[in-house]
């Protein structure tokens, strides 16, 4: 499954690069597919590339949903429903 996430563009860099902020985490991404992106835009990031812009209200709503999912979903390192994916089958 592939997942693209909204992130706010906080810095433009040389060579069609930019820095995005996602809940305090900053990451350098490629803006090669988004020539018109400006600081302050919310962009959709997929595998290190900005692939589109998103309305700020929609971006905030999506980020709130991700935060809620994180609160109710167990961490990936915890077994789900008593199962341990690292155990050998019996």
From Swiss-Prot:
- Taxonomy, superkingdom: Bacteria
Please verify whether the record's keywords include Acetylation: no
Q: Which PROSITE patterns match?
A: HUPF_HYPC (PS01097)
Q: What's a BP term from Gene Ontology annotated to this protein?
A: protein maturation
Q: In which pathway does it act?
A: Protein modification; [NiFe] hydrogenase maturation
Q: Which GO terms describe its molecular function?
A: carbon dioxide binding; iron ion binding
Going by the UniProt record, its keywords in alphabetical order are: Plasmid
Family to which the UniProt record says this protein belongs = Belongs to the HupF/HypC family.
Give the function comment from the record: Involved in the maturation of [NiFe] hydrogenases. Involved in the biosynthesis of the Fe(CN)(2)CO cofactor.
NCBIfam families reported for this sequence: hypC_hupF
State the name under which the record lists this protein.
Hydrogenase maturation factor HypC
Species whose genome carries this gene: Cupriavidus necator (strain ATCC 17699 / DSM 428 / KCTC 22496 / NCIMB 10442 / H16 / Stanier 337) (Ralstonia eutropha)
Taxonomy of origin reads: Bacteria, Pseudomonadati, Pseudomonadota, Betaproteobacteria, Burkholderiales
